């Protein structure tokens, strides 16, 4: 890093909420919400509301987006030795279960809950096998494709854990701002 003063410009990169800048590949977040340290507690919405929200996430738009660059027959990046056999499934990077435990989530309108749950940057495409194996586990918890006893790619898990750690404060900030906190 540099000790000198640097002029900073405020701009928005269309279609990308996070991107890398400069030779040092500094990750920059480009959004209308201020990231805040995530605050988790117990889930404060009913099972019925959870199920209703679950039926509306991922949205159709998100499911289409994770398949934009899908190549059937390509190597599965999560499970060594497996191939992508069809459409990718949209998987929450920070799980829906975890999001619903973020402080103030319960105070949001249904529309804003779905806005948070369908936040496009919080999705990745997983093969059907990988998504079924991962379930609601975090990437740090998901270590094995049990059906065939294949370890999940450590490189892939590490990349996704970094994304998860970046997204958690973004989601908390988004929830706080939508809740007027």
Where on the chain are the PLM-derived regions?
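Histidine-centered active-site/metal-ligand motif
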Residues: 28-33, 91-92, 131
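A boundary/linker detector
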Residues: 34-58
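Short Cys/His-rich Zn2+-coordinating modules
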Residues: 52-64, 105-111
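Short Cys/His-centered divalent metal-binding micro-motifs
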Residues: 115-148
């Amino acid at each position: 890093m540099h000790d000198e003063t640097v002029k900073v410009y405020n701009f928005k990169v269309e279609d990308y909420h996070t991107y890398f800048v400069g030779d040092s590949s500094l990750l920059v977040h480009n959004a209308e919400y201020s990231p805040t340290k995530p605050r988790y507690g117990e889930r404060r919405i009913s099972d019925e509301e959870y199920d209703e929200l679950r039926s509306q996430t991922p949205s159709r738009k998100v499911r289409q987006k994770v398949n934009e660059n899908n190549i059937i027959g390509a190597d599965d990046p999560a499970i060594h030795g497996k191939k992508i056999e069809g459409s990718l499934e949209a998987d929450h990077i920070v799980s829906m279960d975890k999001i619903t435990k973020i402080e103030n989530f319960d105070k949001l309108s249904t529309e804003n809950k779905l806005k948070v749950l369908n936040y496009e940057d919080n999705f990745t495409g997983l093969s059907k096998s990988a998504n079924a194996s991962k379930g609601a586990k975090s990437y740090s918890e998901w270590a094995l494709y049990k059906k065939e006893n294949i370890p999940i790619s450590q490189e892939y898990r590490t990349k996704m854990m970094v994304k998860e750690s970046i997204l958690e404060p973004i989601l908390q900030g988004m929830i706080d701002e939508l809740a007027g906190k």
